[in-house]
Regions:
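S-adenosylmethionine-dependent methyltransferases
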Residues: 2-293
């Protein structure tokens, strides 16, 4: 991926209008970008593609989590609106563009992982992780880059989200491998892999998982128990832990209870703990923990 110090200004959505398309590039100094109607902590470093029939518009951004000094590089669409415009242009009207943003809940969870000072977040060093409903993969990348995870599998039902997560892992210095190669001996950085994964359907994974991570996964009471069963199956061999970050105020009442009840029925002990906010503008976040240890 290009790492040229280019920058663009992405105008915010105003008066219901969608954002303008990105120019191909501008050789100017880095500047703040506006994403999805609010200011982001992301700095656009390069325009990678303006979009075509195969790939949406993509930019490379850098961001810092909490007090960490080292930046994380990510590859992503410039905004949810920009991705939706591309979906419209390519005739994919049933697609969900929400994966194009690093949402506040994921930012808070990733910050807690990166800073490593929250005792309610399990020790991820040398652990084999899977991020469920990963989207852009910010939580998993923070675990790999900042917490010393052995490996991370990004799982999502959207192939383009996995493409971006693995591209981000690569530009952030991770080793990108196939799921079947995660168990191979290697040195250096964490290994990252990706897989299409729909928790509403029974599936097996060709890798052992110690910890399942997720953010903003509990939005449908009808599938909350299915997610719990999926997570329980993923950590069954290792008697591992599941950690799902969610807004303190539920978006759909009953999701959290359904998830916790299903985890308890599967033999887990559960708890809910608060997470520090990534910034003052972010809403309160909680961590839903289920442990089979």
């Amino acid at each position: 991926m290009a790492s040229t110090w280019r920058s663009i200004h992405v105008p915010s959505r105003l008066n219901g209008k969608r954002q303008e398309r990105l120019p191909r590039s501008r050789n100017v100094r880095p500047t703040r970008a506006i994403f999805a109607e609010e200011e982001s902590d992301e700095t656009v470093m390069a325009v990678l593609t303006p979009g075509d029939q195969h790939l949406p518009p993509l930019v490379e951004v850098s961001l810092k989590l909490g007090t960490m000094t080292e930046e994380i590089r990510m590859v992503k669409p410039p905004s949810v609106d920009e991705l939706w415009s591309w979906y419209e242009m390519t005739g994919n009207m049933e697609a969900d563009p929400s994966w194009a943003k690093n949402w506040e809940t994921a930012m808070s969870f990733a910050t807690a992982i990166a800073e490593g000072s929250n005792t309610d977040v399990p020790n991820l060093k040398s652990k084999r992780l899977l991020e469920v409903g990963s989207g852009l993969g910010l939580v998993g990348i923070a675990a790999a880059k900042c917490a010393g995870a052995d490996s991370v599998v990004f799982s999502d039902r959207e192939p383009l989200a996995i493409h971006c997560a693995l591209s981000s892992a690569a530009v952030s210095g991770m080793n990108v491998v196939a799921v079947s190669d995660l168990s191979l001996e290697r040195g250096g950085a964490s290994a990252c892999a990706g897989c299409l994964f729909d928790w509403s359907k029974p599936q097996a994974l060709a890798a052992e998982i110690d910890v399942v991570l997720g953010a903003d996964c509990l939005y449908d009471p009808a599938t909350a128990a299915l997610l719990a069963k999926c997570c329980a199956d993923l950590v069954a061999k290792t008697k591992g832990v599941v950690c799902i970050a969610e807004p303190e105020k539920e978006r759909a009442i009953g999701c959290r209870a359904a998830f916790l009840d299903a985890c308890t029925a599967a033999g887990a002990t559960t708890r809910i703990v608060p997470l520090p906010k990534a910034s003052s503008i972010h809403p309160p976040t909680v961590l839903v923990v289920a442990s089979w240890e």
